[in-house]
């Protein structure tokens, strides 16, 4: 398990130090500073082994968090703890900075006492921690026996992520399906690689201890070995099934229900949380197709034409569209003509940046450019970097659909019909590139 936890600033000075095992000495602090923070070359690996000691580290702004151990531990568990620790600190005092850590060092030590027990991660749910650790410290002497028993039951009980007695004047539930679509396409329009990374993020403002049930597409296939393809016309009609390569859930989800019924049943935490994270490579709806045409006119001129086609329902609007067309290093001037939006040549970035505010589905637009080149003695041909694209669309490129979202609360006097529910789909570009 974790032998010690250290938090450093950008200079390598220790801001927080907590040692849980006798085999971790003061030399471990100096070893990390010298070999990682002050290393001549940037250390890319998140795990560094120094003298039979393993350092697992993450960086937030200019702050380093390092977990140290001499045992053979589960690396995924250690990183999960480090990221959870970052989330907890952010929830308590906002941005993780040197000033905030110094101003809240007593609070951080109190949090570590609860989150880590002899190096073993325990309760890291922010909602549960905030019931008995406040930014003013623990006020145990002012709490009644009833309040203290509620805290004990929450921390040690089955539902550690939600406290009892929550009340709202209006019960609301917000669900966001957030997806990032990644694509690499050949100049001929052949998909070389494509995948979607998705998250289901919820905000729950519900009274009592409700039971929520969330259903997706009629058929969900979990396929960890299958190789996925893509489809260009899937966006024109709703898909009844979706193949998910892998997925992870918040601890509140009852996995047995998902395995048998493919429905997600859970008692939600209060406030905002990530319910589910998934990845898919099959039957992806590609929101845009980029068709490039590059023609060399002698050695001092290039003619570029790029057509973008939207591939989704005409009733939907894509926003924040940006196409980046790379130019050679010896470019001397560019003349641009575009049908829609605004285009500008940025010499510092060696690219033509074409921006369109909005674009409806099943439409197309194009840009033409004449690129003047300076004579050069370099015999190497221009490598032609891929054309990249950014956008935001109001649907899920994976085809994921929310079929129902139900809330049950047996003890309080409200039903599913009394809950105001909001469902939103947002698809964004990840690395969306087309070779030219």
From Swiss-Prot:
Compartments reported by the entry: Cell membrane; Membrane, Coated pit
Topological relation to the membrane, as annotated: Peripheral membrane protein
Xref: InterPro entries: Adaptor_comp_med_subunit, AP2_Mu_C_sf, AP2_Mu_N, AP_mu_sigma_su, Clathrin_mu, Clathrin_mu_CS, Longin-like_dom_sf, MHD
Keywords linked to the UniProt accession: Cell membrane, Coated pit, Endocytosis, Lipid-binding, Membrane, Protein transport, Transport
Main localisation: membrane
Origin: domain of life: Eukaryota
SUPFAM superfamilies tied to this protein: Second domain of Mu2 adaptin subunit (ap50) of ap2 adaptor, SNARE-like
A Pfam family matched in the record: Adap_comp_sub
Chain residues that bind a 1,2-diacyl-sn-glycero-3-phospho-(1D-myo-inositol-3,4,5-trisphosphate): 342, 346, 355
PANTHER family linked to this entry: AP COMPLEX SUBUNIT MU
Record's subunit section: Adaptor protein complex 2 (AP-2) is a heterotetramer composed of two large adaptins (alpha-type subunit and beta-type subunit), a medium adaptin (mu-type subunit) and a small adaptin (sigma-type subunit).
Family affiliation: Belongs to the adaptor complexes medium subunit family.
Name of the featured protein: AP-2 complex subunit mu-A
Naturally occurring in which organism (per UniProt): Danio rerio
């Amino acid at each position: 398990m974790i032998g010690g936890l250290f938090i450093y600033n950008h200079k390598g000075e220790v801001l927080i130090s907590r040692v849980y095992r006798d085999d971790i000495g003061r030399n471990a602090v100096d070893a990390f500073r010298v070999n990682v923070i002050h290393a001549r070359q940037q250390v890319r690996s998140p795990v560094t082994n120094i003298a039979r000691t393993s350092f697992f580290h993450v960086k937030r702004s200019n702050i380093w968090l390092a977990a140290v151990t001499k045992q053979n531990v589960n690396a995924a568990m250690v990183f999960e703890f480090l990221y959870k620790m970052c989330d907890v600190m952010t929830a308590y005092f906002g941005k993780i900075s040197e000033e905030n850590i110094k101003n809240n060092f007593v609070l951080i030590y109190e949090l570590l006492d609860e989150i880590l027990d002899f190096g073993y991660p325990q309760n890291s749910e922010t909602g549960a921690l905030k019931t008995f650790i406040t930014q003013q410290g623990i006020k145990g002497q002012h709490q009644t026996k009833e309040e203290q028993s509620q805290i004990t039951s929450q921390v040690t009980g089955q539902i550690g992520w939600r406290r009892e007695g929550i009340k709202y004047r209006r019960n609301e539930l917000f669900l966001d399906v957030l997806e990032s679509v990644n694509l690499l396409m050949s100049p001929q329009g052949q998909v070389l690689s494509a995948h979607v990374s998705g998250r289901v993020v919820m905000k729950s403002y519900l009274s009592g201890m409700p039971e929520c049930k969330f259903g997706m597409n009629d058929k969900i296939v979990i396929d960890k070995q299958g190789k996925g393809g893509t489809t260009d016309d899937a966006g024109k009609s709703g898909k009844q099934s979706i193949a998910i390569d892998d997925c992870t859930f918040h601890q509140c989800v009852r996995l047995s229900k998902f395995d048998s019924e493919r429905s997600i049943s859970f008692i939600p935490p209060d406030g905002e949380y990530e319910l589910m994270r998934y990845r898919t490579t099959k039957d992806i709806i590609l929101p845009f197709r980029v068709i490039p045409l590059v023609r060399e006119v002698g050695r001092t001129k290039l003619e570029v034409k790029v057509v973008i086609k939207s591939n989704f329902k005409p009733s939907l609007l894509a926003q924040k569209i940006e196409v980046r067309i790379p130019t050679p290093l010896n470019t001397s001037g560019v003349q641009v003509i575009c049908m829609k939006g605004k285009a500008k040549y940025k010499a510092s970035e060696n690219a033509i940046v074409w921006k369109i505010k909005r674009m409806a589905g099943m439409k197309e637009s194009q840009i033409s450019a004449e690129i003047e080149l300076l004579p050069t003695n370099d015999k190497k041909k221009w490598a032609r970097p891929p054309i990249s694209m950014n956008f935001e669309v109001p649907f899920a490129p994976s085809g994921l659909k929310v079929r129902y979202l139900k809330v049950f609360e047996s003890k309080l006097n409200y039903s599913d019909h009394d809950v105001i529910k909001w469902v939103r789909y947002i698809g964004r570009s990840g690395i969306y590139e087309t070779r030219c």
